[in-house]
Amino acid sequence: MPDPAKTAPKKGSKKAVTKXA
């Protein structure tokens, strides 16, 4: 599973960053 923040930073930048971080 690739980093969601890099996969779709526009779909949920805040959510992706929270999951990634």
Swiss-Prot record:
GO terms for biological process: defense response to bacterium; defense response to fungus; innate immune response; killing of cells of another organism. It comes from the Eukaryota. Keywords: Acetylation, Antibiotic, Antimicrobial, Chromosome, DNA-binding, Fungicide, Isopeptide bond, Nucleosome core, Nucleus, Phosphoprotein, Ubl conjugation. The modification Phosphoserine is found at residue 13. GO terms for cellular component: nucleosome; nucleus. The nucleosome is a histone octamer containing two molecules each of H2A, H2B, H3 and H4 assembled in one H3-H4 heterotetramer and two H2A-H2B heterodimers. The octamer wraps approximately 147 bp of DNA. This is Histone H2B 1.
